[in-house]
Structures are given as structure tokens and as C-alpha cells.
A protein has these predicted regions:
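Long, contiguous binding/interaction regions
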Residues: 1-6, 10, 14-45, 51-86, ...
Length: 160
């Protein structure tokens, strides 16, 4: 997998804010690899997480322009830190190697409604890429991956 740039935005929740953000990506010619929008602990505020493939020189300039949008509270380009995805892969048939891989990758093997095995695993994008490669002999019928979850890490605070 190519290196990804992850941008995290905190936004107010009015209609159209996501469309304005996406329009800026388009105008800058930056391709979105994945996009996720979710609620935050703060009512009325959402987090938009966007990944782009490769290192684009224009991403920092794009972040600067996104900061100027009315409903944007914060923009951060995330480097390092914690990045996780979820992979769900349906296989044609079970195989002895499947359960060894599940143990190795700390994955779960489930059964789909049609009886086919389904592998569920969370991990870094690179880990899931490696698992998919190793699952190839098990005949991957289809798979789905979530977008990168990459919380902006701040110094720990006391919670008690």
C-alpha cells in the first residue's frame, strides 16, 4: 500500500460543510482515498477523517484553505500515531491454513449465511494488506475495508 496522508477535521454540523470540503479537494486535484464522518463527544461537532494516497505537496496548502471555511473548527495533518482499519473478507471455502492465519493475525473466523467462512480482522493498513495477500490461496470472494480510524492523539489527561 502506498503511504497515506491523513487529515482530521473538526466541524460544525450545518448542511453542506462536507460538500464544501470535498469541493476543495477536487479543486486542488487531491484524490480522496477514504472518507469518514462521525460524531464527537462534543454535541454539534463532527470529525471528518480523510486519507489521500501518496504524499501530495498540495495537501498542506489544502489544509490551510480548509481552515478558512466558516464551519471548520480545527484541521490537523496526522503523522504517525494510531491508525486502524477493519477488514471483513468472505472466502470460497474453509482451509486448514485459514485458522493458522486467524491466530497469527488475531482475526476472527465467522460463518456467512451461505456457509462460507468470513474473516474479520482489525489492524494497521499494512497488516491488513499482508493478511489479504496470505488469504489469496483461500480464494477471497469479496472483501470490504473500513476507512482509516486515526484519532488525533493529545497528551493524556487525568480522567478521575
Amino acid at each position: 500500500m502506498k503511504e497515506q496522508t491523513v487529515m482530521s477535521l473538526l466541524t460544525e454540523n450545518p448542511n453542506g460543510v462536507l460538500a464544501r470540503v470535498i469541493a476543495l479537494f477536487s479543486r486542488h486535484g487531491v484524490t480522496i482515498g477514504s472518507l469518514s464522518v462521525s460524531a464527537t463527544a462534543q454535541q454539534g461537532v463532527s470529525r471528518i477523517t480523510v486519507t489521500t494516497e501518496g504524499k501530495s505537496r498540495g495537501v498542506a496548502q489544502l489544509a490551510s484553505q480548509i481552515r478558512r471555511l466558516v464551519d471548520i473548527r480545527q484541521v490537523a495533518l496526522l503523522e504517525g500515531g494510531v491508525r486502524r482499519e477493519l477488514l471483513v473478507a468472505k472466502l470460497a471455502a474453509s482451509s486448514p491454513v485459514l485458522f493458522d492465519l486467524a491466530r497469527q493475525y488475531q482475526a476472527e473466523v465467522l460463518t456467512a449465511a451461505d456457509g462460507c467462512p468470513v474473516v474479520e480482522c482489525s489492524g494497521t493498513p499494512a497488516t491488513l494488506d499482508a493478511l489479504l495477500e496470505e488469504l489469496a490461496p483461500c480464494q477471497v470472494v469479496e472483501f470490504s475495508r473500513t476507512v482509516v480510524a486515526a484519532p488525533e492523539l493529545t497528551p493524556m489527561r487525568s480522567c478521575g
